[in-house]
């Protein structure tokens, strides 16, 4: 039996779930929502590529995803999709997850998107079809300032996926820190919002304790460069 997301009486009719990629934008969105006076997320929802057992696009192992959710103190809903997933299959799987417990109780899904209007419109339209709404706590924020705010808040992350068409593969496996920001080419968004890179957050104020992990091998797959992150301890 699942635990109702709003069982503590806090949320009333504003139960939230957070779309969680394991990266810096979703972690910062969680931090922002928890710091606000309004409702904060009661669950995380993540797409996992079943063929690989990893977070879709980011390539992070399932075990590390579970450790993030545990450290964040939130239940995790994994939506499994196949490799090379079509949009129709993705929408069917996601729609099913949103209609079932515990996400059926969530009226609002929060996202860490920053400025891509077409992505926002897509999310809002798809959620409206199932009677839910979207919220974007970081929307419109300056990405240069946001990247530095992330570091200043005490978050620690590593680049786990790089698009070699937009950023040199040598950035895969590097820590997301001031030195990395200084080294990024001028045409690369400091938050990677255009898909230049993705991150894995292993420490920060949204976690009860850091996630013990270390960087492993770097591989190229499906046109992207992935840095494997392994559990430690």
Model-identified regions with their sequence ranges:
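Nucleotide-activated chemistry modules centered on ATP-dependent adenylation/adenylyltransferase
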Residues: 2-233
